[in-house]
Amino acid sequence: MIFDEFSIKTLIRPVPDFPKPGVVFRDITPLFQSPRALRMVADSFIQRYVEAEFSHIGAMDARGFLIGSIIAYELNKPLILFRKQGKLPADVLSESYQTEYGEAFLEVHSDSLCEGDSVLIFDDLIATGGTLIAAANLVRRMRASVFEAAAIIDLPELGGSQKLQDAAIPTFTLTAFALDDR
């Protein structure tokens, strides 16, 4: 299926003043209400990575799980879950980070990766880059490497994709929005 950026962007709903005043939240749930759009998004990532050399897909809590799991299934790659603090039952590694909303903690099971593994880290959106940089730090703490950071949406004005690139993390997104795009 050919990727149609316009069609995808029209299904990403802007929600002004959520979760706090001044923020325009990019709601991807309408993408999941359209089987065609969901397939288009998932297939775009699958086609990009089908021949790539990496060992795992790491998906961010919670919206990163939705597409990340499809990609992992289609590419036959192990899926590791990066969760918000307190959501994983076994031994974890934890990393603090800043979001556009404040400080948070990201966790992963400490036995998720081995030395030498290579991880595609995936989220729905790159804003400040905090979540993906925290995930990259956790990957590196397990002596693995980050293959690439990927997301559906980039908000370049918030600087996250640039921070990732400055940290030597290759970055890929399907589309971008200006902060004032409605």
Swiss-Prot record:
GO BP term, example: AMP salvage
InterPro entries tied to this protein: Ade_phspho_trans, Adenine_PRTase, PRibTrfase_dom, PRTase-like
Catalytic activities: AMP + diphosphate = 5-phospho-alpha-D-ribose 1-diphosphate + adenine
Compartmental location: Cytoplasm
GO molecular function, one term: adenine phosphoribosyltransferase activity
Gene3D superfamilies: 3.40.50.2020
Alphabetical keyword list: Cytoplasm, Glycosyltransferase, Purine salvage, Transferase
Superkingdom of origin organism: Bacteria
Catalytic EC class: transferase
GO cellular component terms, A-Z: cytosol
Protein name: Adenine phosphoribosyltransferase
Gene: apt
